[in-house]
Regions:
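Lipid interaction determinants
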Residues: 16-65, 74-129
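Short helix-onset patch at the extreme N-terminus, typifying the N->h transition
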Residues: 6-8, 24
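Sec/Tat signal peptide C-region and signal peptidase I cleavage site
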Residues: 5, 12-19
């Protein structure tokens, strides 16, 4: 009995952080703008629009329009400047989203730093005098 209890307890973290489905991801993100971090620093910002449309910008980078879709249990993105799919798994952690880049499992994990209802402000390239 003790072994069974220990085995079940070992599964608890796995169960609490299951990959989000497309419907769960859409419900959590649509209409919001998220700031993602990595290694204690800001990484990028993504706005989730209607019809699975997105607007992404690296910190201090130009905005890219794109869309997301579900493929094999992952959330995949394509952008106007990067037509190859970039697939991620998203989980709900204690402090928000956790994203793992599945195209390269060795890549750094991203995490939600903040979210708001404010749209992502995109400046055009080479703005200024």
């Amino acid at each position: 009995m003790r072994i069974l209890v220990l085995a079940l307890l070992a599964l608890v973290p796995t169960l609490s952080h299951a990959a989000m489905t497309a419907a769960e991801f859409d419900a959590y993100t649509k209409g919001k703008t998220f700031v993602y971090g990595s290694g204690g620093a800001a990484y990028g910002i993504e706005q989730y629009l209607d019809n699975r449309q997105v607007r992404w910008a690296f910190v201090e980078g130009e905005c890219q329009e794109g869309e997301w879709f579900e493929q094999d249990g992952m959330i995949c993105f394509v952008y106007e400047t990067e037509p190859d799919s970039q697939c991620w798994t998203f989980e709900r952690g204690e402090k928000g989203l956790i994203a793992r880049f599945e195209n390269d499992p060795e890549a750094v994990e991203l995490y939600e730093v903040g979210q708001s209802d404010t749209p992502l402000i995109c400046l055009g390239p080479d703005v200024g005098v």
